[in-house]
Regions:
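Juxtamembrane intracellular "pre-TM" segments in multi-pass secondary transporters
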Residues: 1, 174-206
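Helix-loop boundary and gating motifs at the non-cytosolic
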Residues: 1-44, 202-241
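Residue-level signature of mid-helix packing/kink "hotspots" within the transmembrane helices
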Residues: 44-48, 52, 135-136, 246-254, ...
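Conserved MFS/SLC helix-loop-helix module at the cytosolic interface between two early adjacent transmembrane helices
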Residues: 49-85
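Helix-to-loop junctions at the C-terminal end of transmembrane segments
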Residues: 50-62, 252-265
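Structural signature of the two symmetry-related core transmembrane helices
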Residues: 65-79, 159, 267-281
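Helix-loop junctions at membrane interfaces in 12-TM secondary transporters
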Residues: 82-93, 284-295
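Cytoplasmic helix-loop-helix junction between adjacent transmembrane helices
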Residues: 94-131
Length: 401
């Protein structure tokens, strides 16, 4: 799994395409802001859909195969997307994002099935560390490529790197499960996903809470910079706030996951969601440098507490034959704010700017309280393997590499 995380870091470094997508569409491609926004929104829907449904491919065909296929499709499209006419972008961009979402859910599923229960918090923390470190390096590298060559080369570089990630993953990930449990020839007798979820109401409460809090959490990328600008703060202040978030997470998330590994997961998650709400509550009195820093510190510590723990909790409660679909549900919930936060937050900020931060604080607090209440609900017990092989879900063959 460490080798997979190395590949995730490399792939994250070059995943800068969609950071500069809006600039490329409104600049070299000559689209209006409205057209660029529509394309970006459609791409975001594709990403969320890929996260929500990618686990099904992994459960049926194998998580390794899902990762390789998703990376191959996404990389191939990105290599040629700069050459496509505008009309074709309405199909190519959401398809590339959908495939990227499948890769994201497959990465999580591979960590879930490759790390023993009890160690998954640390495993997912390592994965998040690799991803966050790559995203820290990627944007300035992308800016250099765009300045030295052109924005079109960003897509080529991203596409080639994604294809190389697929080749690398094919070499380092075994094509069979190292640990296998007896299972029938097919998973026809396995309970349906709905039945598995009904048997785990605490997981359902958690997923709903994550959708709510992600809508709140991602306001930092949409309405927060507008709010700061309206109160006289320039882009440098916002940039430093985001840097605080990234730096603290890189430094503290891994040791925190290790130190808190024996703490009750729902208590940790609930506390993290409450911290997210507390952060936005700091903005209610008004905008100042102190309140902005308080917001970001509270958001960051809330993220450290809930994101890794929630991912591991869902993995620990998933039945083996549906691990991919459980990870897909969490992955989709955890990124849903990327589509929901900008339009909903922007509309509320335009109509009633004084209500945005109080409502964000209340929504996150209610999500946190719901998770804390869910501790009294049955959360299910992960079942024996009744589907694909435990590690990758791929047929046995000689280990590559």
């Amino acid at each position: 799994m460490r080798l997979l995380c190395c590949g995730i870091f490399f792939n994250a470094v070059v995943s800068f395409t969609f950071i500069y997508l809006f600039v490329w569409l409104t600049g070299p491609r000559g689209l209006t802001v409205a057209q660029a926004g529509l394309l970006g929104g459609i791409g975001g829907i594709g990403l969320v859909a890929g996260n929500f449904t990618g686990g099904w491919f992994g459960d049926v065909y194998g998580h390794r195969r899902a990762l390789l296929a998703g990376a191959a499709v996404s990389g191939s499209i990105l290599c040629v997307v700069a050459l496509l006419p505008v009309a074709a972008l309405y199909v190519a961009l959401p398809l590339a994002q959908y495939a990227a979402g499948v890769v994201r859910s497959a990465n999580s599923a591979l960590i879930a099935v490759g790390v023993a229960e009890g160690s998954r918090r640390q495993g997912f923390a390592v994965m998040r560390f690799a991803s966050n470190a790559g995203f820290t390096v990627g944007p300035p590298l992308g800016a250099l490529v765009a300045a030295r060559f052109s924005y079109g080369w960003l897509f080529v570089a991203d596409g080639i790197a994604t294809l190389l990630f697929a080749v690398y993953a094919a070499r380092v990930l075994p094509g069979h499960g190292a640990a296998r449990a007896p299972r029938p020839p097919s998973a026809a007798g396995a309970p349906r996903l709905r039945a598995e979820l009904r048997a785990r109401p605490a997981v359902l409460v958690l997923l709903a809470a994550i959708v709510c809090v992600d809508l709140v959490y991602r306001q930092q990328y949409s309405t927060l910079p507008v709010f700061l600008g309206d109160h006289g703060f320039d882009a440098r202040v916002y940039g430093w706030l985001i840097a605080i978030n990234g730096g603290v997470i890189l430094c503290l998330e891994l040791p925190a996951a290790h130190a808190l590994r024996r703490r009750a997961p729902l208590s940790m998650i609930g506390a993290g969601l409450l911290l997210v709400g507390l952060g936005y509550l700091a903005l209610v009195p008004g905008a100042s440098l102190g309140t902005a820093i308080a917001l970001m510190v509270s958001l960051t510590f809330g993220e450290i507490l809930y994101k890794t723990t929630a991912t591991a909790y869902v993995a620990d409660r998933a039945p083996a034959h549906a691990q991919g679909r459980f990870q897909s549900l969490y992955a989709g919930a955890s990124i849903s704010g990327q589509v929901l936060a900008p339009p909903l937050g922007g509309a509320l900020y335009t109509a009633a700017p004084g209500l945005l931060w109080p409502l964000c604080a209340v929504l996150a607090a209610l999500a946190g309280l719901a998770v804390l209440w869910a501790r009294r609900l049955p959360d299910g017990v992960a079942g024996r393997d009744t589907g694909p092989s435990l590690e990758t879900g791929s047929p046995r063959r000689a280990v590559a590499g």
